[in-house]
Amino acid sequence: MTTQFSVEGIELELTRYPKNQESNLQAWDAADEHLIKHLKETEQVPVATAIINDNFGALTACLRSMESQWPLAVETDAKTSQLGTVQNLENNTLSSDNIQWLNSRENIPGAIELVLMKLPKNLSYFAHQLNRLSQVLPEGTQVLIGAKAKSINKSLLELFAKNLGPASASLTWKKTRVITCTADGKVRALPTESQWSIPDLNLNITNLSNVFASGKLDIGARIMLDNMPKGDFKSIIDLGCGNGVLGLNAKQLFPQAYIHFVDDSEMAVESARQNWALNKLDTLGLVGEQATFGWDDCLTHLNEGIRPELILCNPPFHQGEAITDHIAWQMFLQSWRALKNGGILHVVGNRHLAYHVKLQRIFKNCTTVASNGKFVILQAQKISKKAEPHENGESSSDTPNPQSSLYGGVKR
């Protein structure tokens, strides 16, 4: 893997986030290079620019290297993308001043004069993004999209015309093309959220456009729901929560529990939040917020004082279009650190991913709870001789649950 980005006289050191990933993965692709090449060749001057789907900040860093105060609004659904962009700006001594950071549901400023995008894998999400742009971009605004040449076809160009304005594609360079779309000034309505139900669990589910398994229960979650852990848990984390279905069911099974939902996708976190409210799962009389929600890189920014008794985890094995197991490693390692001594990590995964090897290495134990031809449910318990914080007198007896620091303390 190279970390040296070099295009049209721009020299940068770019790394993925987090840095400790497979050596064959890099922080940008040829579509990033093609977009920058296009800007250089057309002698684009610095104007108020929105950058959308910039995986690890290659586009953002390039524009700030071309002009240190290039006015930018940077939108992403992935927390790791935002953190990676900040990391690469810092590593290249580039200013992040006056960059407006947006999640995938916030509207870009109305004063934007140029938009740079990368084509995401999820075309329903992409159509949603184009719809949102149609609500704020004046007629004639240019939107430049970098994509693999093989991803561009007639139906994709029709998608542009339907949701934002007419589009055309450049010649191929390094197996990529730049699509130029011109906003037609017509405002499109946002698509309705996907809604469905799980009758046997009495749950109603809403999925935003960039949430995995939109419109149905994925088979990994199904086998997990059929094999939820037994016990009396008061503090639970749904790690990589997606629409939150595992955490929702955990609350049904353990009504005295406090649930924390966390995901790298902001749309996933918002879907989980909406689903909690939709299903009205709060237990009457239980003190404090019974559900909290975090947009985070796994458990990186979880309060160190939090000690969950159970973590439910359905790890992704891809980051964008890259196949990788570093996310599972990170989830398992951070789960071991976060869990209360004796706490359980309950995991579902494809059999071929061999998560049992990782769990055995980290936890020194691993039990197969259930399996079928494709999936396996694994359970690992944290057994540590190191004293828990409360054993050293560090916790107060007036906290309502092991996650009190997450919820802001006791309500009196």
Curated annotation (Swiss-Prot):
Gene3D superfamilies: Vaccinia Virus protein VP39 (3.40.50.150). Residues 386-412 are annotated as: Disordered. Residues 394-406 have a biased composition (Polar residues). SUPFAM superfamilies: S-adenosyl-L-methionine-dependent methyltransferases. GO terms for cellular component: cytoplasm. InterPro entries: DNA_methylase_N6_adenine_CS (IPR002052), rRNA_m2G-MeTrfase_RlmG (IPR017237), RsmC/RlmG (IPR046977), SAM-dependent_MTases_sf (IPR029063), Small_mtfrase_dom (IPR007848). GO terms for molecular function: 23S rRNA (guanine(1835)-N(2))-methyltransferase activity; nucleic acid binding. Its EC number is 2.1.1.174. This is Ribosomal RNA large subunit methyltransferase G. It comes from Shewanella sediminis (strain HAW-EB3). The lineage of its organism: Bacteria, Pseudomonadati, Pseudomonadota, Gammaproteobacteria, Alteromonadales.
